[in-house]
Regions:
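C-terminal helical "lid" of AAA+/P-loop NTPase domains
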Residues: 1-8
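Flexible coil/linker segments and helix-coil junctions enriched in charged and small residues
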Residues: 10-13
């Protein structure tokens, strides 16, 4: 365990596959995200994931674009969200609060089965490339919680792009071409994209656009439904 924790702290690409199975002593059992035969060395593995596990690609606080994994556990409780791995930065913490507050206000528009009063949620955030945490975590956090609460596995090989404000306004993707390139390098085959970014696709090389199934959303609720494969 100590070796794994040290490798995680060192970060960097050469150690990312250690994270396919790891233990968080505070809250988690051992988690297996994928097996090497499935993942083929990609950050976003092929094959079915599990409820509450999602991947997002966005810009870190250092300005670099990276891939981040969220893993969620739900348990009986009184409506508390605990986030591990986000570090001490203000933006990531605010984004996770935005997601939970949005869910409290609008959860019934997604599903009556999602409780923010009788369940607690624990989410572990992983900076897969060791470049620093991103602040764009509200939408991925919302999708991760809904996935865990509904017991629905997200679409496989999916990268979540874009962000939402506390009021649900869509925030388009910065540097779309570079972000999609990181999605491709990370192993994504499907990309969830805000409709507000559609106009920027003209700036992206056509072969890069053609590398994915692009899935557009126009509201936060629609993003949740489409990420979970619910029509």
């Amino acid at each position: 365990r100590r070796v794994k924790e040290q490798l995680k702290k060192i970060g960097g690409m050469e150690f990312y596959d250690v994270n396919f199975s790891y233990i968080d002593n505070d809250s988690f059992e051992e988690h297996y995200v994928s097996v090497p035969e499935q993942g083929g060395g990609k950050l976003i593995p092929e094959g079915m994931g599990k409820p509450g596990s999602v991947y997002t690609v966005s810009k870190s606080k250092t300005g670099m674009i990276g891939c981040y994994m969220l893993e969620t556990q739900m348990m009986p409780g009184n409506g508390k969200l605990t986030c591990t791995g986000i570090g001490s930065g203000k933006e990531p913490k605010e984004a996770t609060n935005t997601a939970f507050n949005y869910l409290k206000a609008n959860g019934n528009r997604i599903s009556g089965q999602i409780s923010t009063t009788t369940k607690d949620y624990i989410i572990n955030y992983q900076d897969m490339q060791g470049i620093g945490m991103t602040g764009n975590l509200a939408l991925p956090t919302l999708i991760a919680i809904c996935s865990a609460a509904l017991g629905k596995t997200p679409l496989n090989s999916l990268a979540i792009l874009g962000e939402i404000s506390i009021g649900g306004t869509l925030i388009k993707v910065d540097e779309l071409a570079s972000t999609l390139q990181v999605c491709l390098d990370s192993g994504a085959k499907k990309v969830l994209l805000p409709i507000t970014s559609a106009g920027d696709l003209g700036t992206v090389p056509s072969d890069l656009v053609g590398a994915f199934s692009l899935i557009f959303y126009s509201t936060a609720e629609e993003a949740v439904f489409k990420a979970l494969g619910v029509e």
